[in-house]
């Protein structure tokens, strides 16, 4: 079975009905599969914190939301996670790709990988 299809099948099986995504090379197959599913309302976001706001609205509107993003934006989203998602106790599954390890062609991704590990360790 195709892993992208399996991931999205599991989202549907768990009643995820709203997904927002930020472009991500590693998760492009999952994003394409989400886009092609009638069971999921998909809204691409310009930025990760914008996507979290969309997910908050979807949750308040009775949907089960999720966001798909890269780890390099984790730092940008901390304020939104703390002051909106966590403060109001909104469940928000997040599928996050991980960049910045060996052979990473984009140097700024490597720097953020170091910070990602530190943030997740807290």
Language-model-detected regions and their locations in the chain:
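Thiamine diphosphate
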Residues: 1-122
